[in-house]
């Protein structure tokens, strides 16, 4: 299993837009065979930082998802929403191996 950790720098005035974006991607990742662990919005502390975690069975499955993202109309629409609203300033991606016990 591989877990992807995304750290977003977001516009603090557009947290509601970022939340909407996150809800779109939760459904899309799950539809693509991944397991989305949620988006995490700012509460206390930094107001311009958000996170997401999702997993795929393997890195190969994640690579298939990445190919799908660039062709699926709903994925393209979700990306366009973020670009149009400018709720995301930048993002970073990390690949992690989870330990459960």
PLM regions and their residue ranges:
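Absolute protein N-terminus
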Residues: 1-2, 101
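Short beta-strand-to-loop capping motifs
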Residues: 7-12, 54-58
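An amphipathic, aromatic/His-enriched active-site/gating alpha helix that lines ligand/cofactor pockets
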Residues: 20-37, 55-92
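Long, low-complexity, Ser/Thr/Gly/Pro-rich intrinsically disordered segments that act as flexible linkers
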Residues: 43, 88-101
């Amino acid at each position: 299993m591989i877990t992807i950790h995304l750290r977003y720098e977001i516009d603090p005035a557009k947290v509601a837009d970022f939340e909407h974006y996150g809800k779109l991607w939760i459904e899309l990742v799950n539809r693509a065979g991944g397991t989305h662990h949620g988006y995490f919005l700012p509460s206390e502390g930094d107001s311009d930082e958000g996170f997401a975690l999702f997993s795929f069975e393997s890195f190969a499955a994640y690579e298939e998802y990445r190919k799908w993202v660039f062709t699926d109309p709903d994925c393209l629409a979700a990306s366009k929403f973020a670009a149009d609203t400018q709720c995301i300033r930048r993002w970073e991606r990390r690949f992690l191996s989870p330990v459960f016990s």
